[in-house]
C-alpha cells in the first residue's frame, strides 16, 4: 500500500472504516447499511445523499474484499495515468450513475407488480395473481414489493465496474490472470465478458445482486471516457 496513490488508498481506507463502523453500530442496534444504503426512491427511507453514501457500505467480508482488491489492482493504475482529481471524479460520478440506473431498474421492476396488484385488489377473490407470466400468491407478491421498497442497495461495485471498463478501454490488449481461468485474457475481452454476464444475470437471475447497477457503472464509465476522448486531453489512450 506504500506505493498506492492517495485517492486509491483513501478510498480503500474509507470503505474499510465504514465496513467496521457498520459492524460496531449493529451491536448498538443501529443498521448503518439501512441508513446509508440506497433505498428505492418511493420508499420513506430514501434520502438523496444515499446516492453517494451507498457506495461506501458493504454487505459482507467477501463483498468488500473483492471490491477493494479491484480498486487497488486497477484504480491505482488509472489514478497514475489520470491524476487524483480526475480519477476521483470518475469514481464518484460512475458510482452515482450506477445508483441512478439501479433506481430506474427497480422502478420498472416495481411498476407491473403494482399495476397487477391493483387489479387484484379490485377482484380480491383470486387465490393467486399472474404478473409478467408468473403466478404467485398475493402474499408472495407483497413480499416482493416489500423487498424492492425496504432492502437497500450497498457496495462500491458500480464504481468498480466503471474502473474495469476504463482499464479495458485504455489498456485493451493488457493480459490479466483471472481465477479460475488457466490462461491470461486480454482486458478488452474481460470487459465484454463481464458486460454480457451482468446483462444476462440481470435479466434472468433473481439472486438479490444489483446487476444493473454494475452495468450502469460500466455504461457511465464508457460514456465519460468517450466524452474525454472526443474533447481531447490524453485521458483515453489505447495500448
Positions of predicted regions on the chain:
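A detector for small-residue-rich transmembrane helices and their helix-helix packing motifs
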Residues: 1-239
Amino acid at each position: 500500500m506504500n506505493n498506492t496513490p492517495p485517492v486509491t488508498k483513501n478510498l480503500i481506507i474509507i470503505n474499510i472504516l465504514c465496513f467496521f463502523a457498520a459492524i460496531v453500530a449493529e451491536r448498538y442496534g443501529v443498521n448503518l447499511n439501512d441508513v446509508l444504503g440506497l433505498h428505492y426512491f418511493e420508499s420513506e427511507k430514501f434520502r438523496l445523499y444515499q446516492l453517494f453514501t451507498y457506495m461506501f457500505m458493504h454487505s459482507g467480508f467477501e463483498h468488500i474484499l473483492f471490491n477493494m482488491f479491484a480498486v487497488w489492482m486497477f484504480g491505482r493504475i488509472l489514478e497514475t495515468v489520470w491524476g487524483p482529481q480526475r480519477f476521483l471524479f470518475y469514481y464518484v460520478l460512475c458510482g452515482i450513475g450506477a445508483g441512478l440506473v439501479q433506481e430506474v431498474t427497480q422502478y420498472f421492476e416495481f411498476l407491473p407488480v403494482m399495476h397487477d396488484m391493483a387489479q387484484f385488489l379490485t377482484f380480491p377473490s383470486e387465490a393467486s395473481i399472474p404478473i409478467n407470466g408468473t403466478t404467485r400468491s398475493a402474499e408472495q407478491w407483497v413480499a416482493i414489493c416489500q423487498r424492492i421498497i425496504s432492502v437497500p442497495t450497498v457496495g462500491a461495485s458500480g464504481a468498480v465496474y466503471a474502473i474495469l471498463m476504463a482499464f479495458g478501454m485504455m489498456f485493451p490488449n493488457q493480459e490479466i490472470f483471472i481465477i479460475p481461468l488457466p490462461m491470461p485474457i486480454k482486458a478488452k475481452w474481460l470487459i465484454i465478458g463481464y458486460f454480457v454476464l451482468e446483462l444476462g444475470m440481470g435479466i434472468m437471475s433473481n439472486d438479490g445482486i444489483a446487476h444493473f447497477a454494475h452495468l450502469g457503472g460500466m455504461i457511465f464509465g464508457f460514456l465519460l471516457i468517450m466524452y474525454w476522448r472526443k474533447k481531447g486531453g490524453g485521458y483515453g489512450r489505447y495500448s
